[in-house]
Amino acid sequence: MDRLKLYFSVFVLSFFIVSVSSSDVNDGDDLVIRQVVGGAEPQVLTSEDHFSLFKRKFGKVYASNEEHDYRFSVFKANLRRARRHQKLDPSATHGVTQFSDLTRSEFRKKHLGVRSGFKLPKDANKAPILPTENLPEDFDWRDHGAVTPVKNQGSCGSCWSFSATGALEGANFLATGKLVSLSEQQLVDCDHECDPEEADSCDSGCNGGLMNSAFEYTLKTGGLMKEEDYPYTGKDGKTCKLDKSKIVASVSNFSVISIDEEQIAANLVKNGPLAVAINAGYMQTYIGGVSCPYICTRRLNHGVLLVGYGAAGYAPARFKEKPYWIIKNSWGETWGENGFYKICKGRNICGVDSMVSTVAATVSTTAH
């Protein structure tokens, strides 16, 4: 087996960048980083080696030599970016992901999709203050059967629809005792709900949307169909194919939670998984661990699902272990920790506490 094949066999399980001093790399030189291989000593690979491994793992094929060379240049820039992220976010592991041949603008357009805007739809409530004295130290809705398997939005800015359906899936589970995968494509095709004060800021399929607007649409239209009855295509549909006789989950009400982590945790435990917006700047290079960057903007651009929290997930140098949130993403199981992301609690890192919503479900009378 040649050297690349040998490295690739372990690359699938473990591929990440460890810290390298900035003096090691000049922008004009080939990037050399270290790769941890199967628990052995780190192996030194060039950027060409990494790109070959990347193409094999993710099945990347480019239409021309020009496209190949361009993607290689983008890939090298993203290796440098991952190295910077590793320094700024040392409690997580950053490296090569399926997005490593995308520019930042391509990544934002294809894989994010939360629109800016904080105005509440007319039917939204402000969540009541809940008691927080007896919250469990650790909690995870995956352990209680309220979370469907990780999905994949593909190259479509529909993250908002996955965040909204995930919250309603959990709420419907609490209301009915049944976990049913709901249709994101229904929201992509049929939901054109607009911000109440910005008529041109509407849910717009692969071009973005808001979870609260999706809840407003779902409340008005009667609910959502099953995923299997209205399957996801990852494209904007030309027509809405809603069949109201096949609605299986309905919204009774939805609320916005204050920027208070104890209240967020209390609502999570009581009401099920929560729809959350976040800044995804560090997520393009995230491999695993608890992300707690020293610097991260709170400009929200990605919709995710908050499913749990832990009391002690990482320990900065000379400090005791710190708590973290557990987030379900919509980029497939090959990304992150089997499709999940951990981010530290305590400082509204990357805006994770800024736009949090809870939804309650009723049993649809037309459910099949």
From Swiss-Prot:
Glycans are attached at N253. InterPro entries: Papain-like_cys_pep_sf, Pept_asp_AS, Pept_cys_AS, Pept_his_AS, Peptidase_C1A, Peptidase_C1A_C, Peptidase_C1A_papain-like, Prot_inhib_I29. The keyword Signal applies. Pfam families: Inhibitor_I29 (PF08246), Peptidase_C1 (PF00112). Keywords: Disulfide bond, Glycoprotein, Hydrolase, Nucleus, Protease, Signal, Thiol protease, Vacuole, Zymogen. One of its GO terms (biological process) is response to salt stress. GO terms for cellular component: lytic vacuole; nucleus; plasma membrane; vacuole. PROSITE patterns: THIOL_PROTEASE_ASN, THIOL_PROTEASE_CYS, THIOL_PROTEASE_HIS. Residues 1-22 form the signal peptide. It is found in: Lytic vacuole; Nucleus. Its EC number is 3.4.22.-. GO terms for molecular function: cysteine-type endopeptidase activity. Disulfide bonds join C156-C206, C190-C240, C296-C350. Induction: By high salt conditions. Induced by drought stress. Probable thiol protease. Required for RRS1-mediated resistance against Ralstonia solanacearum. Plays a crucial role as host factor for PopP2-triggered RRS1-mediated resistance. Interacts with the R.solanacearum type III effector PopP2 to form a nuclear complex that is required for activation of the RRS1-mediated resistance response. Belongs to the peptidase C1 family. This is Cysteine protease RD19A. The lineage of its organism: Eukaryota, Viridiplantae, Streptophyta, Embryophyta, Tracheophyta.
